[in-house]
């Protein structure tokens, strides 16, 4: 039986993967944008089965995150290991910009941020050469196009990792692989044989996303582009390819000398939508005539690959040893043909504690939440608590769909923009979410289940008061805007619409969302065994094609006073996602 790697290796909204190997262990970090805690870190022994071991950015090490459009925050981390220390270099658009955190143990604790005020631009990366010298590279408007105008390019500088400062001025080493290629970014450097290899993303992170390669014999020399660029993309496969938006790669060498790349991509739903956002995929890489060749033989990301033989042998040697995480639960490759868009659905406990990717069973019987849970923005007030085997969310004044604001660095560190919202990523194309809520709204208060995408595109299944009546209703929120929030002149207007409404007087209610692709069936009842349908909603109305594809769907529980701080609390007895 041939063991397999199944894509995506980390399903759901876990984009911009960066990977490193330390001995027999593999570690991977992803972007988290405006979620808190931030920058999830995963561990694997076989590249197939990943377990989250921590968040690098937490309340304990001074993490600030502001809820806004969903597309700000922290993005494009690079994870590296050198001389007994792990490094994550990243950009926080809700704080001072570029920073580094370090840890002796990748499971934490991670240091407080070392702010890199002398590091320009975004998507900074660290590189340690064979002699141990560190270098920093990044993305910025550094390339002179010959007309006196600076264009986006890649820069490189020697770096002092002990004092977190650049040694000398940054040197521009590359602009784009293709002439006037859009958005060259996310650079990583590798020293392989006689060459330094530069891997970047290009084309923007949507349909035209791509991986580009360049090389130089001298670190600060001229980097020649690979004549075969792009070395990986799906943009030539049309807008209905089941795997789309491929790019943003990082490479890792295995103990036997073989290579793999982790990269982001999206699964297409019903040939048009990408509600799950950008996920983490993997593919083999071989070296041919001095260049990296991604996914040899096919040149595209496959749903499955043969597992690395060296890791299969290591895992099989551990079977029966009791080390289940190291041995893994391999797939046998017997996936049915014609299941385009469906492969990669998580099965089993691939996550941490009680929950796997897309599998959550939460009865709130512990004060410690599992890694699958996230807040939207940092919670500054005590608007949530776990007591008496229930989650309690307070009806604070902020709502989930407040008017959007322009995105800037160094935002205000206050309670002004927090929300009482606790959510999990949607990791499966077909998902059922159910929860039990106890809540009697007054005034403008509301609470319930929310399906949240970026840019105020949301569904709320909520208990509220409407024209003096106690009701259950499904609300749709959308936003019209002129440019992305990180562009000058951003302006937007949020609209709301009642999709369905029914009277409901009881304090307790069970809420359910049955998501089957883009068909959202909304149900409710007194118990989970006595549910009836409220309506069927269209998931396409909030899919990333409407709002840009930076983030993915979050589903969770919320409470709000809709403009007023109230003393009422919504109580959630349990939550399930399957």
Give residue spans per PLM region.
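Carbohydrate-active catalytic/glycan-binding domains of CAZyme proteins
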Residues: 1-578
